[in-house]
Amino acid sequence: MAVKIEQALGEKRSLNDNDEVPRKKRYNFRKKVELDYSALNEGEDKKSKFFHPHIALFEKEFEKCLSNVTEDMSMTCSEYCKRFDDIDFPLKISDPENSGMVVSTNNKTTRDLTVDDITQAVGDDYFVNVMDVQSQENERWSLREWCNYFNKPAEEKDRIRNVISLEVSHVEDLQYDRPDIVDDKDLVDIVWNNVENLDTENDPRPKVTKYCLMSVKNAFTDYHLDFAGTSVYYNLAFGKKKFILYPPTPENIENYIEWSTSTYQNMLFLGEKLTGGVAMELNGGDLFMIPSGYIHVVYTPEDSLIFGGNYLTFRDISQQLKIVDVEKQTGVTKRYTFPMFDEVMGRTCEWLCQNQKKGKQMQVKKETVNDLISYMKSGKTKYKPTNFINKKQMLQELSNLYL
């Protein structure tokens, strides 16, 4: 997910590019002082419209944070799967070909795909949110318009723009398989597939699982948290990306909230206030995994095509609930929050009760159950149970079984 840009998937965005939004309308998700960096730079170097003013500070911070990268921030897919429940740091998968991640269309697979291929698969007239990197605002373009822009030589582009919210799980002409570990750990899939008596055919699940991102050289996405503290998988088809990621320590989260609610947020470089940053550079073919709650900023040194998505996990329920609270404190509007989040948490409660009654052995921390009950007890949390008379009965049963 910041006043000027959209939220999620390692880079801020809205949930669905084809939501009904008036064409060419600029919009943000918090009301703040609007600052157009290109306008501020007008009259200076004409090239300034092609560089976000924070890039120099980003590069300095990136070099500093390289020293915090450790050997275990690169591991095989097999090792990652074995250690998944204990991993709380970002890392690269050293053998992405063994992950199960694959995207293909027109007899081409991930590394050979182009923006033209994506446009053909999704449709020329499909609308996408296009972010102006300087103003950090969005406009609605057709995919054909975007494709034409992307393919122009750099000197012919009028501004630096970014597409980071094209959800493609519905696209029939695009075979898109997530990493196997993501399919196994996705909490939405777990509860939708296993809670008894759910009408899953008439009850669509949240669509935040499969995205296509397209960034031109010098695109920049300012500091943000992915919505609801979701974890992220991020597969670079071609190009280059630079990330700086900071752990969700109490101090970092406090500074993030202060920055997010500042009237002049756009002019402040948050990296100067955060600690423990890790710098990661991604190249074509890399598969990157971001855990729950990491604050991060992204720079694009080369034109890039990325496939990735967000997912909730049972492992991170407590952290995810903390980030949901941060979203409330910083005034994130519903459009930029995880869809049906309360429904997912409610179904998680039912799933836990169901498993315990059936004698299924699960390692469940009391902290997780307490945090879940506390969140669900709130009168602001709306959920109608499927297998209980009401929410109160469900939570009492959950407490009796686990606490």
UniProtKB/Swiss-Prot annotation:
Substrate binds at T221, K241. Keywords: Chromatin regulator, Dioxygenase, Iron, Metal-binding, Nucleus, Oxidoreductase, Transcription, Transcription regulation. It comes from Candida glabrata (strain ATCC 2001 / BCRC 20586 / JCM 3761 / NBRC 0622 / NRRL Y-65 / CBS 138). This is JmjC domain-containing histone demethylation protein 1. One of its GO terms (cellular component) is nucleus. Its EC number is 1.14.11.27. Histone demethylase that specifically demethylates 'Lys-36' of histone H3, thereby playing a central role in histone code. The JmjC domain mediates the demethylation activity. Belongs to the JHDM1 histone demethylase family.
